[in-house]
Curated annotation (Swiss-Prot):
Native source organism of the sequence: Helicobacter pylori (strain J99 / ATCC 700824)
Gene: murJ
Annotated membrane topology: Multi-pass membrane protein
Any one Gene Ontology molecular-function term assigned to this protein's record: lipid-linked peptidoglycan transporter activity
Subcellular location per the Swiss-Prot or TrEMBL entry: Cell inner membrane
Transmembrane segments: 4-24, 50-70, 95-115, 122-142, 155-175, 228-248, 257-277, 292-312, 336-356, 366-386, 428-448
Family under the similarity heading: Belongs to the MurJ/MviN family.
Identification of the protein by name: Probable lipid II flippase MurJ
């Protein structure tokens, strides 16, 4: 993408158009839906009927919303990129209309993935994101010789094709594990001729749906402060110089890799067992699992942060600097990436402790925490942007993560938290590994610099 679109007005247009669908993708994929759905699904006595109704309700609402945007996308385009001029808005509007349909596709993917989580099947969910990226890459390769505007249309349809591929990936495990039959039979259960059974199922479904939606909306808010903050940063960045939206997007994409690979993956895999342990009142088991996950995440995310900051320019250059992506774009993107990485530990560790809140069905408390950190982060963005420009937005995002972490730990309980982190041996191992990494990277950078200078002067 950086090779073909670079970091300018056309890349900004796509990132703005893809921002809202991508926001929903990250919110749903990172657990907001499953952390509300799974506890309700586990507790439901009519699992198939409950799940099928949830799926139909969401699909119906999202389809109508997508249709509304397709018929009149201008209002949403102005909302997403208020700082764009009229000509750029005109180019952006049809791209927004196409990409918005991905909302419906990503919900279906997330819904099917949540059902598979119940059966402890994570393969489809883990690999579905790669299908989206693959389809986007194929679309860009096909449009390589096209104009930038034509490439935007190819890329947008590539997003939709990726969404369909993600859904299809879930079908085989759904059928194999009997979940497809569960959904189908659950829906047919509402058509039974037995009046008593039908009345019981309808009443039970109403209660389950009411309980689910009561938890869902606070869960979305509570689990998506980072995504909403990033969304707001894109809107604010549209007032800055051309390319600012792209710098944020490219840096954030790399930042999301360790976050998704470790923090989100572990929290997603851990959530069903935490929810069941809480239901069975196994507090010691919960604390034991959280402690193991804590030290693993601290170690891995700290090493990723150190490595990413020390090699930020090299990583950005390797991934993006070709074609339309200039050395200046590399420098700014690498600086943004380094500032994003300051928030990797707090954002990643917050995912771990928020599990406890969601498993206890305390979504309202999580939503309150998220709102506070979101407003503090927004205030930081507006304060730092005039001083640091796009770098201020990245720094504010990391500060928002720190606020979120402190507030989540407060809700979890400082005494319980101190009990989890009390392990001197683990801390010493992490400190040793961090020191070794720093020394190795310093030696590596020095060696590469000397090698470059040697061959550079040899050329003369």
């Amino acid at each position: 993408m950086a090779n073909i679109l670079g970091a300018g007005v056309y890349s900004d247009i796509f990132f703005v158009a893809f921002k809202l669908p991508n926001l929903f993708r990250r919110i749903f994929a990172e657990g907001s839906f499953s952390q509300s759905f799974l506890p309700s699904f586990i507790r439901s006595s009519i699992k198939g009927g409950f799940a099928s109704l949830v799926g139909l309700i969401f699909c119906g609402v999202l389809f109508m919303w997508c249709l509304l945007v397709a018929l009149n996308p201008l209002w949403l385009t102005k909302l997403l990129a208020y700082g764009f001029d009229e000509e750029t808005l005109k180019l952006c509007t049809p791209i927004v209309a196409i990409n918005f349909w991905y909302l419906l596709l990503v919900f279906i993917t997330t819904f099917l993935g949540a059902l598979l989580q119940y059966k402890h099947s994570f393969f489809a969910s883990a690999y579905s994101a790669s299908l989206l990226n693959l389809c986007m890459i194929l679309a860009l390769l096909i449009s390589k010789e096209k104009t930038h505007l034509e490439a935007l249309y190819y890329l947008s349809y590539g997003v939709l094709l990726g969404g369909v591929a993600q859904i299809l990936l879930h079908f085989y495990p759904l059928v194999k594990l009997g979940l497809w039959d569960l959904l189908f039979k659950g829906l047919l259960g509402f058509k039974t001729k037995n009046t008593n059974k039908k009345e019981y199922r309808l009443n039970r479904a109403k209660k389950d749906l009411k309980a689910f939606f009561k938890q869902f909306f606070p869960s979305v808010l509570g689990n998506s402060s980072a995504q909403i903050a990033s969304f707001l940063d894109t809107t604010i960045a549209s007032f800055l110089a051309s390319g600012s939206v792209s710098y944020l997007y490219y840096a954030n994409r790399v930042f999301q890799l360790p976050l998704a690979l470790f923090a989100i993956a572990i929290s997603t895999a851990l959530f069903p067992s935490i929810a069941i342990a809480l239901k069975n009142n196994q507090q010691d088991l919960i604390l034991q699992r959280l402690q193991k996950a804590w030290f693993f995440l601290v170690g891995v995310l700290l090493l990723c942060s150190i490595g990413g900051i020390m090699l930020s320019k090299e990583i950005t250059e390797l991934l993006f600097e070709r074609g339309q992506f200039s050395p200046k774009d590399t420098l700014i993107t690498s600086q943004v990436f380094s500032l994003y990485l300051l928030g990797l530990l707090p954002f990643g560790l917050t995912k771990l402790f928020s599990l406890w809140l969601y498993a206890k069905l305390e979504q309202k408390k999580a939503a309150k925490i998220s709102l506070i950190s979101l407003f503090l982060g927004l205030a930081a963005s507006l304060s730092l942007m005039p001083l640091l420009g796009v770098l201020g937005l990245a720094l504010a995002n990391s500060l928002s993560g720190l606020f979120l972490f402190v507030l989540t730990i407060k809700a979890f309980g400082f005494q319980s938290f101190l009990g989890i982190i009390k392990n001197l041996k683990s801390w010493l191992v992490i400190l040793f590994l961090a020191c070794v990494e720093i020394l190795l990277l310093l030696a590596f950078k020095s060696w590469v610099t000397h090698l470059y200078l040697f061959y550079y002067f040899q050329g003369f």
